[in-house]
Amino acid sequence: MKVLAIIGSPKKGNSYRITQQVENRLKSYAKHDSIGKVDLEFDYLFLKDANLELCKGCFACIPRGENKCPLKDSRADIEKRILASDGIILVSPVYSMNVSWLMKNFMDRFAYTLHRPIFVNQKLMLIVTAGEVGLKETLKSLSYTMGGSDLVSKLAVKTPPFKYRPKYEESIARDVDKASQKFYKSLKSDKPLPPTFLNVLWFQAFKAISEKTKHHFPADYEFYKDKNYFFYETKVNPLKTFAAKFMIRLFLRGFDKNFYTK
């Protein structure tokens, strides 16, 4: 199994240190797995060193497709690295109650995956560190990326610039263990979780809107036109589909009152 940690810090500080601890835990679990030694490859992508230019906000990737982005850098190569991985760890320190600018730019450059989820085979773990406050807010912000991925584990660690007492070091170790075990367990399962109602609602909403706005958002229309029930082949509870479509019909009534889409 392959794990890619995407580091959004401009330096190798607390966020990197905690990620290294997770790496060590995962490799230990793989080495001593009950089924025998598991081959686990752990790699890093440091956004500070990546050739990922600042998003221009041109909106080209959303309606027309990511291949229409005017920036010629390593975005497509990064996408390939993510798709080739079984697990992704997004890592960011808390800056001004949110993710770092490096991570925010990464999120902006891959915003098209929220319209067209492609990371359906990837398990996702989030790691955030902060001196004291902003952990909850940053985790929430970081969760709105990597469209299609299965968010299975979150780790938030307070890392103030003081020497830690032994008991606090132990509490960090316990949190790292718990989050790492949860992530490792999910990596061993190649079966995606059954779609929740919110997942189905998300799919049906984008499919319905893509059909109504196909001239404005051709990339979305092409992505959804051959998909009937979900982003990938899986069993979907018909009651969830019925309820989602009913809610979307109600939503579209208001949509049509406010916007011209033809």
Regions found by a protein language model. Name each.
Residues 137-140, 144, 148, 182, ...:
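Compact, basic/aliphatic-enriched, mixed alpha/beta core segments that act as assembly/interaction modules
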